[in-house]
């Protein structure tokens, strides 16, 4: 036995040199099965991935024949053996595996289970990390092979020789220029996270932006409510041309001391009571034009009208606020200032109505939106004494849903338009409650003959 043969027998199986095969033969890599080497067509894969994979197989054949000097029979035996060992010892991978990988695709460097496309090659996590660390820390100049660079690299032997493993990474096509240093890697990771967050925001905005618009049934309901409002709204859209300003001297001379420190100008109060009766009548007519309202018992109709009348009249006045003259137009005909309305009997309630008018001026409400607001106020199921509470609540829900869908259809440019508009319902309910309290005091302070009968009928309990 020669010294060389004795030395060779002492080497591990993976470090033994093999006879040089016929260079014209195409040889397989150790550790890769027939199924892996003869994969199905990659037509369904990305074009770039197909080209890279084809290149990788050509490089593998060159590596096997020129570097490893393997015997063809040896290669076949080791391939089958390694594949069987791999299948026996394989553990189920619970990590993320990209969809572009074939089932059980193997690393082109060591034959372990691949986890993705890393640095232009399909590799396992181990070879990806080894290649990255080698480049980032410039370790390859310090690598050396004890066996003249002829080591076989598979998933068992890959940690035995760093030089041969790195050489194989290069030969199969792993790109050194794609490895980033720590600062660039952190910057890339930050950019990826920012892009993910951006996509999340865009998807959220897209889902929020997709808002339903009225159905055919809701359009019919909207049409009915709008027509009811237009038919009972004095002067319609021509109110500015037809309004008359209350003389400035009226409402400036308080005569009666009202509760809570307020003062009442009886002349102004007399003017307001003259227009209050037709204003109440129009609210009643509006309600009677709604089929849902007419289906309710008469007792419930009366309770709903008494509860919402001041709220609807206040809304109709508020949407006719004129910022230029700083006035509200009552019943479509009488323009009054804040002071005149306050001294005319409403006191602090007038401030709430004017403030509402100022805030609504930026909403640019159309007749349909005003009409639907009135319908929501009318169908308030929490009025004391109602019998058909559930039915009224159902009616209000129908109006609210149609209202919201109509707002989506209108596409207002005010931020959070719908919730802000719903808050105005709360403001109007507060105005109604404050007016009820104010009315009780006014009955005591003002002469009874100044109150119109319909006014007393609606606002008295």
Curated annotation (Swiss-Prot):
Residues 107-181 bind DNA. Zn(2+) 1 binds at residues 107, 110, 124, 127. Disulfide bonds: none annotated. Zn(2+) 2 binds at residues 145, 151, 161, 164. The keyword RNA-binding does not apply. Gene3D superfamilies: Erythroid Transcription Factor GATA-1, subunit A (3.30.50.10), Retinoid X Receptor (1.10.565.10). Nuclear hormone receptor that can act as a repressor or activator of transcription. High affinity receptor for thyroid hormones, including triiodothyronine and thyroxine. Binds DNA as a dimer; homodimer and heterodimer with RXRA. Interacts with the coactivators NCOA1/SRC1, NCOA2/GRIP1, NCOA7 and MED1/TRAP220 in a ligand-inducible manner. Interacts with the corepressor NCOR1 in absence of ligand. Interacts with C1D. Interacts with NR2F6; the interaction impairs the binding of the THRB homodimer and THRB:RXRB heterodimer to T3 response elements. Interacts with PRMT2 and THRSP. Interacts with TACC1; this interaction is decreased in the presence of thyroid hormone T3. Composed of three domains: a modulating N-terminal domain, a DNA-binding domain and a C-terminal ligand-binding domain. This is Thyroid hormone receptor beta. It comes from Rattus norvegicus.
């Amino acid at each position: 036995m020669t010294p060389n043969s004795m030395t060779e027998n002492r080497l591990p199986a993976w470090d033994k040199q093999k006879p040089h095969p016929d260079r014209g033969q195409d040889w397989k890599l150790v550790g890769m099965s027939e199924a892996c080497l003869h994969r199905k067509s990659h037509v369904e894969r990305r074009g770039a991935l197909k080209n890279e994979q084809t290149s990788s197989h050509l490089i593998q054949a060159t590596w096997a024949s020129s570097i490893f000097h393997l015997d063809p029979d040896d290669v076949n035996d080791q391939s089958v053996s390694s594949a069987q060992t791999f299948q026996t010892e394989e553990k189920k991978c619970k990590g993320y595996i990209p969809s572009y990988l074939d089932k059980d695709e193997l690393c082109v460097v060591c034959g372990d289970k691949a986890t993705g496309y890393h640095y232009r090659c399909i590799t396992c996590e181990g070879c990806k990390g080894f290649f990255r660390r080698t480049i980032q820390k410039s370790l390859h100049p310090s690598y050396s092979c004890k066996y003249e660079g002829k080591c076989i690299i598979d998933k068992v032997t890959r940690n035995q020789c760093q030089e041969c493993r790195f050489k194989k990474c290069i030969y199969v096509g792993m790109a050194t220029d794609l490895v980033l240093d720590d600062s660039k890697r952190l910057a890339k990771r930050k950019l990826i996270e920012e892009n993910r967050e951006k996509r999340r925001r865009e998807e959220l905005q897209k889902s929020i932006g997709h808002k339903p618009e009225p159905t055919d049934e809701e359009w019919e309901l909207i049409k009915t409510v709008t027509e009811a409002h237009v038919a009972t709204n004095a002067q319609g859209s021509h109110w500015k041309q037809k309004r008359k300003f209350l003389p400035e001297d009226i409402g400036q001379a308080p005569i009666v001391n009202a509760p809570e420190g307020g003062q009442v100008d009886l002349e102004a109060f007399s003017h307001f009571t003259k227009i209050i009766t037709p204003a109440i009548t129009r609210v009643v007519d509006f309600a009677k034009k709604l089929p849902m309202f007419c289906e309710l018992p008469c007792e419930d109709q009366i309770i709903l009208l008494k509860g919402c009348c001041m709220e609807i009249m206040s809304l109709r006045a508020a949407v006719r606020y004129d910022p230029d003259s700083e006035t509200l137009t009552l019943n479509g005909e009488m323009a009054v200032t804040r002071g005149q309305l306050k001294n005319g009997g409403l006191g602090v309630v007038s401030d709430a109505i004017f403030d509402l008018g100022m805030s609504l001026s930026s909403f640019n409400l159309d007749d349909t939106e005003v009409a639907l607001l009135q319908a929501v106020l009318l169908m308030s199921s929490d009025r004391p004494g109602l019998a058909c509470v559930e039915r009224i609540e159902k009616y209000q829900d129908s109006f609210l849903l149609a209202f919201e869908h109509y707002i989506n259809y209108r596409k207002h440019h005010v931020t959070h338009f719908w919730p802000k508009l719903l808050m105005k319902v709360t403001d109007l309910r507060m105005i109604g409650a404050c007016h009820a309290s104010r009315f009780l005091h006014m009955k005591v302070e003002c002469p009874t003959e100044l109150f119109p009968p319909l006014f007393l009928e609606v606002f008295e309990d």
